[in-house]
Amino acid sequence: MKRFNLLLLVLLAAVSCAPKAQYENRAEKILAEINDPNSKYVVVISHRGDWRNYPENSIPAIESIIRMGADMMELDVKMTKDSVLVLMHDRTVDRMTNGKGPVSSYTYDSLKTLRMRRPHNITTDSIRVPSLREALLCCKDRILVNVDHAYPYYKQIVELTEELGVTGQVLMKGKSSVDKVAEDMSKHEKNLLYMPIIDINTPKGQKLFAEYQEKNVVPLAYEVCWQYPAPEVDDCIATVIKTGSKVWVNTLWSTLCGGHGNDDDAAVNAADPAEVYGQYIDMGASMIQTDRPALLLDYLRSIGRHD
């Protein structure tokens, strides 16, 4: 089966040959867990970092989830007027800083004069919008990175990750066709890890998933999203596991993971978070993106599915 830049062969060898492999850094260990179809380890992806305590997509938010023990930082990227990639989810800086206007209207130096906001709209004294370079250096060898809202900047991101030596630690995901992804990746000597997003309740999502099966392409993982329970959900997840990929589930909000009562908020309100997270473990999910990393990590550790 074909794989386009899904993991270094040395990681495959390390997983298959050594019962207790030694890794040079934590990021390498997490990659090996993801690539091992027999691993019971559940990878925790923190959505925009620890945004409940720090500004989202900020360096302190990243440092906090690394201390927690999360495995991957999901971050969002925009480009400044002078072509510097920075961390920002929104098109404008209004919500997250004391400034106004589109990110693209600021030079990087002018953007750095703005102060970031904590939750509840509190402006910090000294936390600034980080560049993608700063964020990747913070994460390097310590945690994996999922770069979101970033496919238009693929070329620039690959050039940056190659310069910093982190290309194999950075994941991008999308809904492009198999052929489109392969064509785009063929333009580069080295590529980021890539994962398709499958909205399995929709005809487009079903078509994309069928395309991967028909072309015999096995990605590192699939992000499977569903708004409501249905036979196609169970069939998709079973096929993903059977073919050797990992299942990524989003518990950020209910429309991504099966409807009302199935998300992070439900886990907080439940008598036991197992009532929510346990159902995804039972389904075979081995990667979970969450807005409640501390809660999810505590649960996974309690059942022996995380360090």
Predicted regions and their residues:
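Bacterial Sec-dependent N-terminal signal peptides
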Residues: 1-26
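Phosphate-group recognition and catalysis centered on beta-loop-alpha active-site segments
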Residues: 17-307
